[in-house]
Amino acid sequence: MTEEATTTLSSADITEIMKLLPHRYPFLMVDKIIEIDGDNTAIGIKNVTVNEPHFTGHFPEAPIMPGVLLIEGMAQTAGAICAKKEGQTGNLVYFMTIENARFRKPVVPGDRVEFHVKKNKQRGNIWKFHCDAKVDGALVAEADIGAMIVRKDQA
């Protein structure tokens, strides 16, 4: 397999995402990846439904997706880039840092969230990303995050 083959993935359905990420229901926050540009950028999709468990308490009368789950969706989209770049889906991607997090608008059931992630820097197994979450093209959240790739046998 060539280097290009291990780092390029134009899109990923849920089956491919589950090969890249260890997360499962109810904590898998990315339903689909519609674009991955090598190890530089990706766009992940989350279709928000009222049937998700966090809406039973956040908030029953006016459900709003918790901001921390938007951050998690950003991190998982970034994690898919890291996992695909490494060419070894057996590695773990640990979410390490969050900076400059801002929540601009509420996300509610029925929304389709796009997680736009862009790699800013990579040094060894440490990756830094800028992430935007958008609904209908409008910015709803943003953050700078850091991740670290760890082999499962070292976790």
Swiss-Prot record:
Sorted keywords for this record are: Cytoplasm, Lipid A biosynthesis, Lipid biosynthesis, Lipid metabolism, Lyase
Q: Write one Pfam family the protein is assigned to.
A: FabA
This enzyme's EC code(s): 4.2.1.59
Q: What is its main location?
A: cytoplasm
Q: Which Gene3D superfamilies match?
A: Hotdog Thioesterase
Question: Could you tell me the Gene Ontology terms of the biological process aspect for this record?
Answer: fatty acid biosynthetic process; lipid A biosynthetic process
| Cellular localization per UniProt | Cytoplasm
Which organism does this sequence originate in?
Rhizobium etli (strain ATCC 51251 / DSM 11541 / JCM 21823 / NBRC 15573 / CFN 42)
Fetch the InterPro entries from UniProt. Answer: FabA_FabZ (IPR013114), FabZ (IPR010084), HotDog_dom_sf (IPR029069)
Which residues are the active-site ones? Answer: H58
Under catalytic activity, the entry for this protein gives: a (3R)-hydroxyacyl-[ACP] = a (2E)-enoyl-[ACP] + H2O
Family statement: Belongs to the thioester dehydratase family. FabZ subfamily.
The entry's cellular-component GO terms read: cytoplasm; membrane
- Give the classification, highest ranks: Bacteria, Pseudomonadati, Pseudomonadota, Alphaproteobacteria, Hyphomicrobiales
Return the broad EC class: lyase
**NCBIfam families xref list:** fabZ, PRK00006.1
Domain of life (superkingdom): Bacteria
Q: Which GO terms describe its molecular function?
A: (3R)-hydroxyacyl-[acyl-carrier-protein] dehydratase activity
Task: Please report the name of this protein according to its UniProt entry.
Answer: 3-hydroxyacyl-[acyl-carrier-protein] dehydratase FabZ
What's this chain's function? Involved in unsaturated fatty acids biosynthesis. Catalyzes the dehydration of short chain beta-hydroxyacyl-ACPs and long chain saturated and unsaturated beta-hydroxyacyl-ACPs.
